[in-house]
Design a protein with these regions (language model features):
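A cross-family signal for N-terminal binding/gating loops and helix N-caps
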Residues: 1-149
Length: 152
């Protein structure tokens, strides 16, 4: 796994996870998004979905200050599984070196959505954090496959 590394994640505490977590906005109606934001002040949508970056930053900092989000003490990989209908996909979250991207060891999914990638870059710059995944594809890797199978 030469191109990804573990890191100390900043994530919701177990007590707050259900308040913070939200389905992909790609699968939510505008009304559902607004309802979720208005009825749950700790919803991730209040950080991720804001058009005004100053409001996003303010909410993000408040969530850290109130310990809604806490930084893990040790470096880790994070494994997730997304299921929609009859399809499931497993992912591994880690940090990647830009050189791996530059050398085409990984390829970003967001590249195909120029406007979305520009929005994400502004968001990362504003928050000094990457708060959503950047999907990347990589060559088949037995270590990653085994790791995900063990923990899912």
């Amino acid at each position: 796994m030469y191109f990804i590394n573990p890191f100390k994640g900043l994530r919701p505490t177990k007590e707050n996870a259900s308040s913070v977590a939200v389905s992909s906005t790609d699968h939510l109606s505008k009304d559902s998004v607004l309802d979720h934001k208005n009825n749950n002040s700790w919803s991730y949508l209040n950080v991720f979905g804001e058009k005004d970056n100053s409001k996003s930053k303010e909410q993000f900092e408040l969530m850290k200050k109130k310990s809604i989000l806490k930084k893990d003490k040790k470096n880790s990989f994070y494994i997730y599984k997304i299921s929609t209908g009859n399809h499931s996909q497993v992912g591994i979250v880690g940090t990647a070196k830009l050189s791996a991207y530059d050398n085409l060891h990984i390829r970003g999914h967001e590249e195909i959505f120029f406007e979305r990638s520009q929005k994400r870059m502004k968001q990362m710059d504003n928050l000094n954090a990457q708060i959503g995944p950047i999907y990347a594809v990589y060559p088949d890797n037995k270590q990653l496959n085994d790791l995900s199978l063990i923990h899912i």
